[in-house]
């Protein structure tokens, strides 16, 4: 038990609130339920990177939008009697509790999702507990490091531009001030390493392992999440080291699509999602300012979406359409859920606003207040229905295999 308040260092909140995290998950489940439960669609779903952000949302839509049995893989820190664990641990625990209350199969694996050990455990559970096959594999890993399964070598990714230094207006989120951010370009080695960590190699290893073990159902699909963003963030993102990794993901999708079409009449796609506040996006320089602006503009235009809205739309309007039509894709075979964010009217408003923002008018011209609230929400804070001066149980256990 502990009384827990937020402590923010840099772009990380170092504390989490178990009750707040549980209520966040409950709200996401309710949002999905409101759209109705479908009988068709995916029934046995594996989510790699299932404890927060888009991966968690993908698991929630599968379970509570389509009554699917789900297996989630993630790397989180459990809480103890005296100390809170990571937000993802409590998110996964809450998901498990609500899924089981619904009579759905739910199991989780806590360990390194990049490891062969995790793949072996997943295959074992699919064979022994999930009827032998899965029909959807969601790949949603966002990690700054990857330990290579063959050699044990640890590779790190770099959030850097390519070619020349990147200078831009940004928010110092600790001081709530507008600053000039400058980032030196990535070296060739850093670019290669970023592709190794954030590209399609591990996704390919997962699908190869699952296909090799014959645990992919007829018609099985796989989707990996990506972000392209607008040209405002391109120097640091799409045209930076991370963009190279995401292009590798695109190429992997084309290979996997051919493989699955041939082997199980299935398919593979990259899904390009909109920018949202996640632990991953808050680490990217310039993103907090861009998010604060784009949220305000999209809210004004009535097209703002959170993580859960995006995933519900991906399943319902793209992948599993009631009219049975194939998903609409772009010229590279990608599912585009960033379509509303990239509308000309939205982006032009962002570009017009960008040079006007100063420390003095930051809260007035943008939804930075909303950004800050959503950031703290990720860790279970800033909820009106939680008394943060009360003791809360931190040692939460659930149906999770520890690797």
Curated annotation (Swiss-Prot):
Signal peptide boundaries: none
Amino acids binding substrate: 227
Name of the gene: fabV
Stated family: Belongs to the TER reductase family.
Plays an important role in discriminating NADH against NADPH, annotated site positions: 76
Species per Swiss-Prot/TrEMBL record: Pseudomonas putida (strain ATCC 700007 / DSM 6899 / JCM 31910 / BCRC 17059 / LMG 24140 / F1)
InterPro entries linked to this entry: Eno_Rdtase_FAD-bd_dom, Enoyl-CoA_Rdtase_cat_dom, FabV-like_NADH_b, Trans-2-enoyl-CoA_reductase
GO biological process: fatty acid biosynthetic process
Function: Involved in the final reduction of the elongation cycle of fatty acid synthesis (FAS II). Catalyzes the reduction of a carbon-carbon double bond in an enoyl moiety that is covalently linked to an acyl carrier protein (ACP).
Keywords: Fatty acid biosynthesis, Fatty acid metabolism, Lipid biosynthesis, Lipid metabolism, NAD, Oxidoreductase
Pfam families xref list: Eno-Rase_FAD_bd, Eno-Rase_NADH_b, Enoyl_reductase
GO molecular function: enoyl-[acyl-carrier-protein] reductase (NADH) activity; NAD binding; trans-2-enoyl-CoA reductase (NADH) activity
Protein name: Enoyl-[acyl-carrier-protein] reductase [NADH]
Positions of the catalytic residues: 237 (proton donor)
EC numbers: 1.3.1.9
Reaction catalysis annotation: a 2,3-saturated acyl-[ACP] + NAD(+) = a (2E)-enoyl-[ACP] + NADH + H(+)
Binding site for NAD(+): 49-54, 75-76, 112-113, 141-142, 246, 276-278
Oligomer and partners: Monomer.
Functional pathway: Lipid metabolism; fatty acid biosynthesis
Enzyme class: oxidoreductase
């Amino acid at each position: 038990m502990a009384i827990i308040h937020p402590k923010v260092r840099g772009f990380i909140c170092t504390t989490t609130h178990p009750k707040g995290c549980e209520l966040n998950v409950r709200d996401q489940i309710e949002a999905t339920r409101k759209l109705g439960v479908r009988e068709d669609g995916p029934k046995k779903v594996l989510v790699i990177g299932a404890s927060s952000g888009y991966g968690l949302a993908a698991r929630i839509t599968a379970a509570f939008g389509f009554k699917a049995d789900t297996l989630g893989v993630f790397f989180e820190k459990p809480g103890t009697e005296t100390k809170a664990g990571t937000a993802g641990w409590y998110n996964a625990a809450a998901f498990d509790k609500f899924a089981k209350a619904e009579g759905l199969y739910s199991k989780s694996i806590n360990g390194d999702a990049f490891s062969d050990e995790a793949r072996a455990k997943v295959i074992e559970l699919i064979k022994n507990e999930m009827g032998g096959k899965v029909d959807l594999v969601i790949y949603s890993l966002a990690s700054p490091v990857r330990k290579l399964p063959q050699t044990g070598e640890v590779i790190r990714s770099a959030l850097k531009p390519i070619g020349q230094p990147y200078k831009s207006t940004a928010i110092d989120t600790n001081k709530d001030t507008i600053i000039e951010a400058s980032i030196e370009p990535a070296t060739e080695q850093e670019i290669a390493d970023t592709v190794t960590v954030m590209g399609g190699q591990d996704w390919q290893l997962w699908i190869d392992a699952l296909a090799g073990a014959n645990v992919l159902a007829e018609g099985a699909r796989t989707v990996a999440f990506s972000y392209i963003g607008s040209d405002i963030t391109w120097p640091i993102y799409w045209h930076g080291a991370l963009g190279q990794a995401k292009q590798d993901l695109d190429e992997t999708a084309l290979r996997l699509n051919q493989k699955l079409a041939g082997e199980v009449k299935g398919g593979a796609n990259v899904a390009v999602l909109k920018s949202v506040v996640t632990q991953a996006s808050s680490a990217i320089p310039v993103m907090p300012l861009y998010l604060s602006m784009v949220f305000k503009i999209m809210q004004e235009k009535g097209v703002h979406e959170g993580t859960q809205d995006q995933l519900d739309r991906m399943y319902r309007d793209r992948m599993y359409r009631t009219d049975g039509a194939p998903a609409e894709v772009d010229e590279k075979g990608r599912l585009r859920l960033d379509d509303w964010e990239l509308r000309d009217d939205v982006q032009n408003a962002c570009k017009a606003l960008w040079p006007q923002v100063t420390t003095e008018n930051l809260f007035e011209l943008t939804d930075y207040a909303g950004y800050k609230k959503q950031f703290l929400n990720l860790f279970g804070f800033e909820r009106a229905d939680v008394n943060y001066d009360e003791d809360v149980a931190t040692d939460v256990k659930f149906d999770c295999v520890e690797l």
